[in-house]
Amino acid sequence: MIDKLKTETRNQATMALDSMPIHDILKAMNREDGKVPTAIATQLPQIEKAVKLVIASFQQGGRLIYAGAGTSGRLGVLDAVECKPTFGVSPEMVRGVIAGGEQAFTEAVEGAEDDERAGANDCNRLNIGEKDTVIALAASGRTPYAIGVLKEAEARGANTVSIACNKEAKMSQYASVAIEVETGPEVLTGSTRLKAGTAQKLILNMISTTAMVGIGKVYQNLMVDVQPTNQKLVERAKRIIMEATDSTYETAADYYQKANGHVKAAIVMILLDCSYDEALTKLQNAKGFIRKTVDK
């Protein structure tokens, strides 16, 4: 029953929320938010397992698919769309799907989360396969749509991961890796867009970022596959080249042009004193890893 879920119980520290001064409300929210990283820390071994599945999928040419309803679905879409500009991957490589379709991102779609079959249908629509990793999110851990996604993804041979914010979540039994972060009662009873949503976002940050490190999208702690799609990102790309090679801005800008805006190639060209074509060949031989390229 939903009333047994800790995410749905009342927070005893905020029973008088409607009469608390603004400052006290903010302190209470800040205090509760501070509990989230500690809760996540207990699940790091499970998160690590999930990351390894995602890396394996990427190495085989597979995809990472996030799926959820409401806030959970929106958070998956948010993380997915940020991967393209940050890591230079195709929008197909990391996808986010939400119960009720795209319109559900900006407005609630009545009954969408209760439709288990819709979760299965979305897996079919995306042609989920054995090379893919599917991560279903649900704060309650019992959302039918998310369970439908996991069941169908497993049936189609994909890696499956569940992220819930309650222990002994129903959806965990349908995932090969189950992440259960107990975030507890919300400041505003049942409003899982708060601590539960924060926990989900932090976990997705961990999974996508660490997986991208694992396939060579990062050098040192620099996002070397950034896509310079606007002037701000062009400048960031040049500064990444500067930092990675300890060169001047002028040198970085020069090699940025010589490399046709390819940040990785520019870095290798400077560090190994080679041509653009040679840099591309070396990177290809090292499967895109700059460190493996320059340390040979």
From Swiss-Prot:
CDD domains: SIS_Etherase. Disulfide bonds: none annotated. This is N-acetylmuramic acid 6-phosphate etherase. Pathway: Amino-sugar metabolism; N-acetylmuramate degradation. It catalyses: N-acetyl-D-muramate 6-phosphate + H2O = N-acetyl-D-glucosamine 6-phosphate + (R)-lactate. A lyase-type mechanism (elimination/hydration) is suggested for the cleavage of the lactyl ether bond of MurNAc 6-phosphate, with the formation of an alpha,beta-unsaturated aldehyde intermediate with (E)-stereochemistry, followed by the syn addition of water to give product. The keyword Hydrolase does not apply. It comes from Shouchella clausii (strain KSM-K16) (Alkalihalobacillus clausii). NCBIfam families: N-acetylmuramic acid 6-phosphate etherase, PRK05441.1, PRK12570.1.
